[in-house]
Amino acid sequence: MELSSNLKDLYIEWLQELVDGLTPKQEQLKIAYEKAKRNLQNAEGSFYYPTDLKKVKGIGNTIIKRLDTKLRNYCKIHHISPVEAPSLTQTSSTRPPKRTTTALRSIVNSCENDKNEAPEEKGTKKRKTRKYIPKKRSGGYAILLSLLELNAIPRGVSKEQIIEVAGKYSDHCMTPNFSTKEFYGAWSSIAALKKHSLVLEEGRPKRYSLTEEGVELTKSLKTADGISFPKENEEPNEYSVTRNESSEFTANLTDLRGEYGKEEEPCDINNTSFMLDITFQDLSTPQRLQNNVFKNDRLNSQTNISSHKLEEVSDDQTVPDSALKAKSTIKRRRYNGVSYELWCSGDFEVFPIIDHREIKSQSDREFFSRAFERKGMKSEIRQLALGDIIWVAKNKNTGLQCVLNTIVERKRLDDLALSIRDNRFMEQKNRLEKSGCEHKYYLIEETMSGNIGNMNEALKTALWVILVYYKFSMIRTCNSDETVEKIHALHTVISHHYSQKDLIVIFPSDLKSKDDYKKVLLQFRREFERKGGIECCHNLECFQELMGKGDLKTVGELTIHVLMLVKGISLEKAVAIQEIFPTLNKILMAYKTCSSEEEAKLLMFNVLGDAPGAKKITKSLSEKIYDAFGKL
């Protein structure tokens, strides 16, 4: 007995058997088999080998293998010599190339495979990895060229410096534009550059530099596209973004004053609390505001000595007379291993930055910036890592910015009530504390877009806590228009305050957490602010990177966040638990040491059952915590 020259009917019959053998749960597989059977019935021509079915739409290698098994069993039962069909790998290798593969690339690939693979391994060809080359005028292309232009090879540069230069090399905006709903900028291409080892990221705040492969590729792109950098053949000037750490020597307050020929300045006792005193007065009364400002001006003029004169220059430095003041603003020194710059008063301008989410309404998103502009007050809008309004100082020579010691958190009454209810209020309060800003304001707008329910007492308690216990200041306004008036009045005070101050701007290179951010700031304040006339602050880039919600969590912060995932655990309860059990491992070990399940369920209750106020743990909550951690 021999097989027919056309086994189409047998294949259709076996496909039906495959359909009948499926369970009700294999609905998708049933649809695939029925589709294959239907297409085979409508197909023209003869089908002898199972591999001949490959040309039928809906029949792939899996179905062919199952039909091949059935054909072999059929031949065995009927004592027919088995069909020697060509292998699937040989069949697939003879198929025409895909549309996306050019004929030239197919020839090259086949030649390489013939050279590198043994004959028996031709069926398992390895896909060759292509070298990553960013598309012309793309984000990655612009970042590479800007890094090369900034000479970011021996030392890295910041994200802001890259973005400032990269715009001319890209067809896309490097930063998000929230007003046009462009939530992602071309800067996101940095991830691909790091993945392919073209750019190196290091330090906190982050610094970016080119690797050897990155330098080679970028120079090739520059040559291929005929790009020339503006100052390619010039010597690096005094404002060069890449600085040599070896030229930075250690200088404390005494050394700094000796270098600039300054005398020891008496401490201005009233100067620290001046801004806080102004806050609680009627800021909407210009005459009263001016009287206080110029009264403070007279006090300062009697005690402070001008910081603009540079009387002595070391022998190894040659500074032109016309550039004395500008040169002094960019000298970088070190204290406790941290770099800093001295900005003399008059060498920087002060203005507020408003968070892009601070709007009057959905239809009037730029209300505050336009209102400040009408009052002749410069402002910027960008995404802030912390706070709704911060004041910055921008160096007129270098363009670098630093965060001043004033931050405002704006809340409507209904938003404040919601933030208390979902624990955002305490979380924001803690982050504001870690910012190190001396003047922290809660600006409360007494307008509501919703009902606050039974939150009156909670609102009073929360506001009293931040005013009395945490020493925050509060500004109350009736609406957005009055908010503009109060912010403008506060800006007047801040601008005058810093018109007679020199700034020590800190440039740390390796901060691990928000606690380190504040620790470094306090160290500088203890050294440089003890004689008055100088104020210390971090650069804006450092503030933006370290004060965000999601980055640089310590083990303790992670423990608190995990504990708050248990329903019923507020921030206060989580902090109380973390003080006793510093890490999650300590919690797990505490449950393992319990002698019985009943003891484990009451572990947290026995520890914090008598804790005061919001830190108290009830028996039911203690059992919930056991269910989450005690059964692991």
Curated annotation (Swiss-Prot):
Cellular component GO terms, alphabetical: Holliday junction resolvase complex; nucleus
Top-level lineage group: Eukaryota
First-level EC class: hydrolase
Covalent S-S links between cysteines: none
Presence of the UniProt keyword DNA damage in the record: yes
Residues annotated as the enzyme's active site: 415
GO biological process, one term: DNA catabolic process
Family stated for the protein in its record: Belongs to the XPF family.
Protein's UniProt name: Crossover junction endonuclease MUS81
Taxonomy of the source species: Eukaryota, Fungi, Dikarya, Ascomycota, Saccharomycotina
